[in-house]
From Swiss-Prot:
Pfam families: Marek_SORF3 (PF07153). It comes from the Viruses. It comes from Psittacid herpesvirus 1 (isolate Amazon parrot/-/97-0001/1997) (PsHV-1). This is Uncharacterized protein sORF3/4.
Length: 290
């Protein structure tokens, strides 16, 4: 299977007429398999990301206060991570060929992402791990962005359209199941990264984001900032009932993709995961923090 570097290389030289060099090895990729490749790559990225996310949640150490002004290195690493998350959001919107609001509704059931109670708890743990965790989150986001960008280019070429345009449509119409699950997982990765990185980045918004996404990130950051300012930060080892449901829903989405693509072992079945409602990643039972 192509690696993230393959996708990044293809995206970097898309639209150029340069011949392959002596190091070039063509990769076989037909447009009909684009969504399957995206789903496979997103499922692998989601496993790594949510494993890191859950380990961060399990850490019993936290500063108990907003992670502002924790050093230049962490600040710049967090800013790069926020920028990577915004680019991934932009790439997923382009891949779905829909408006930013439509993909938000598909992923969370709302027009804008919302922070959860455990986001403020875990955002205060970021300085403990430092820039290394931010580097991991950036790598996950950048790899998924390269995959989504290359898939977008393949779909545009298949449809015969020019100027990187595809007909606008709601993201759930005529879309394979693994494609819809991939977009939902990708958007949840974006939401999680923003929730954890924005406080350490002093809520600085990247300048290279598109206008609609920049506004959404700004609103999300305002909600998160207000929650950190006015609400007590949860105990580092505190648990929430809805948090377990959240992780189970993410895991079930990964299992569904893997079973559709026949990547999971035969002994792995969806019944191994407790049933959760077939709904977007949003959790209606979790009260927003503001």
């Amino acid at each position: 299977m192509p690696s993230c570097l393959d996708y990044a290389f293809a995206a970097a030289f898309h639209g150029t007429d340069l011949p392959g060099g002596r190091f070039w090895r063509p990769r076989a990729c037909a447009p009909v398999f684009v969504w399957s490749e995206v789903a496979c790559a997103v499922a692998l990225s989601a496993r790594i990301f949510f494993e890191a996310r859950e380990r961060l949640a399990a850490m019993p150490i936290g500063e108990g206060r907003p992670p502002y002004g924790r050093g230049t290195e962490l600040y710049h690493a967090a800013r790069r991570t926020v920028s990577s998350a915004a680019r991934l959001w932009d790439a997923l919107v382009a891949l779905a060929a829909s408006a930013a609001e439509e993909i938000c509704v598909m992923a969370w059931g709302k027009l804008e992402p919302m922070p959860y109670l455990w986001d403020t708890r875990d955002a205060t743990k970021i300085p403990v791990l430092g820039p290394k965790l931010m580097a991991l989150f950036s790598a996950v986001a950048d790899g998924a962005t390269a995959i989504a960008t290359e898939a977008r280019n393949s779909l545009v070429g298949e449809a015969g359209h020019h100027h990187n345009t595809l007909p606008r449509q709601p993201p759930s119409m005529d879309m394979p199941v693994q494609a819809r699950l991939s977009l939902m997982l990708g958007m949840e990765i974006v939401r999680c990264i923003l929730a954890l990185a924005l406080p350490s980045a002093s809520f600085n918004i990247p300048d290279d984001a598109t206008e609609s996404i920049e506004e959404s990130v700004r609103i999300f950051g305002a909600r998160l900032s207000l929650a950190l300012a006015k609400d007590p930060i949860p105990d580092p080892v505190g648990k929430f009932e809805e948090e377990e449901t959240y992780y189970l829903r993410c895991l079930r989405s990964i299992y569904e993709i893997e079973n559709i693509l026949s990547l999971a072992p035969r002994r792995q079945r969806l019944r191994d995961v407790p049933q959760t409602p077939n709904s977007p990643m949003c959790l209606p039972t979790v009260a927003p923090m503001c």
